[in-house]
Amino acid sequence: MNLPVAIDYPAALALRQMALVQDELPKYLLAPEVSALLHYVPDLHRKMLLATLWNTGARINEALALTRGDFSLAPPYPFVQLATLKQRTEKAARTAGRAPAGSQVHRLVPLSDHHYVSQLQMMVATLKIPLERRNKRTGRMEKVRIWEITDRTVRTWLSEAVEAAAADGVTFSVPVPPHTFRHSYAMHMLYAGIPLKVLQSLMGHKSISSTEVYTKVFALDVAARHRVQFQMPEADAVAMLKGNI
């Protein structure tokens, strides 16, 4: 079996089950589970949105804002530019009225999976998604979003995929709203050895504390793997205290 990141999948699955006990820890899917879920998304346009969430860690509103111009797919280092909408919203809330022009926070996320990049190129070519389109009301040219849908539609797509998987005997032990892909991306990158500060930048977290929540899952793993023993034969303990050992 060829896994995208060399991890002990049974151990990772057991760790995830242990983490599920704590409500404050993120709910995430492992790479084989994401690939299996995508198998049950028949439409390429739908599948590539979910694959984009998985390959970039984007928030759903960030992904739905993407246009063709936000992607640079040329080798050797394809990437996507995401507007970090959560930080932008927070900044706007602190100022009177709208945020000043040019204040939008962006982040670059490398697209390191060649299969994803090739599928994205195929989708754009097949659906003939334009860069711009004239607004019929204003007459102005505007950038065209790749996925002109709402997050509610995405949730419906996911529900349909989960139902199709269940009908085929495949189930998932965590809920699968759009944000699950963001958590899954973060955990997948940590499994791949990406440093925490780098992950913070890729995720668009303003504070490192937001990123550190993912390392709490690995804290469970480290503690469990050490197999620390607390008990010794009671007779030996008594003898030790008496000075006989």
Give a label for each model feature.
Residues 112-172:
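Active-site/catalytic core of tyrosine-dependent DNA strand-transfer enzymes
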Residues 39, 132-136, 156-201:
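Short, basic (Lys/Arg/His-rich) helix/loop patches that form interaction surfaces
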Residues 86-88, 203, 208-228:
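Catalytic-site neighborhood detector that most strongly recognizes the C-terminal catalytic loop/helix
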Residues 65-122, 219:
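Conserved tyrosine-mediated DNA breakage-rejoining catalytic core shared by Y-recombinases
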Residues 53-76, 197-198:
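Short, charged phosphate-coordinating catalytic segments
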Residues 9-35, 90-114:
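DNA breakage-rejoining catalytic core of tyrosine-based enzymes
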Residues 1-28, 230-245:
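C-terminal secondary-structure termini that scaffold catalytic or DNA-interacting sites
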Residues 31-60:
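Basic, Lys/Arg- and aromatic-enriched nucleic-acid-binding interface segment
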